[in-house]
Amino acid sequence: MSPKSANSTPTTTPKAKARPKPKRKAKRRRVNPALAWARRLARYRPRLLEDTLDALASIYGPQVWRRRLDPTSELILTILTQNSADTNAEKAFVALRAAYPSGLPDEIHEPGVGWGGDGLPPGAPPDWPAVEAAPLAELIDVIRPGGLAPTKAPRLQATLRRIREERGDHSLEFLGDMAPLAARDWLTTIPGIGKKTASVLLLFCFNHPLMPVDRHVERVAKRIGLVPAKALPDLATDQFNAMLAGFPERTYEAHVLLIHHGRAICQARSPKHDLCPIRDRCSFVDPKAP
């Protein structure tokens, strides 16, 4: 028998204290920079965009949306304008009409203030299946007046091929029934089509509230503080769309008025400050402007 008493209580080893589980760091919500900018602008400079548009409309007049071309023609014409003068792109498009006639009803392309050419004469859209199937050397020769033909001809055919493979034909009318951002996302899956090109098509063909930001829009917007001075074009595009979310019906007006102002008064060199109705908010005139 153990020398210990039978009634003695057995000793127990104290349990080690469990280590506290490390606290998980709360995931930081990802901030949308475009929305953040729009909210900041609304807080510190309320009505800046609306007041700017009102001031510009007082000298350039009201801007009414009107469809120019069918969406496939608009897309091809926009591709032809890339790194080329609008007047040269018009020559190339007219040459496409003549070389590949479709026999469809005529369209009228009236140039707006954002268009640097003379506008297209009335004419039917080209026969897109024939353009896609044309020998490459032949197509290069047809669109040569537009400039950069060896680069643009294969791009045109690849774009038309992609549309046909996705949709069964070359029509882009279905984009009018899609939500604006979904339609833009679809277009930007096509190689060589960015946000600006897609937004131009969707705004001018369907009046979708998507803001194309070209060099004139960007220059005016940065000078008056609508977008940050160092914003890259894609971010500036998103910031504009965030600002216009409260009044999307003014998107076309905003695009046209800012282009008009950038061409006529707020030029890159020697802007005409004495004629500018928004010079009181321009950092180019006064670096301390609000």
Task: For each feature predicted by the language model, list its residue ranges.
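Catalytic cores of DNA base-excision repair glycosylases
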Residues: 35-290
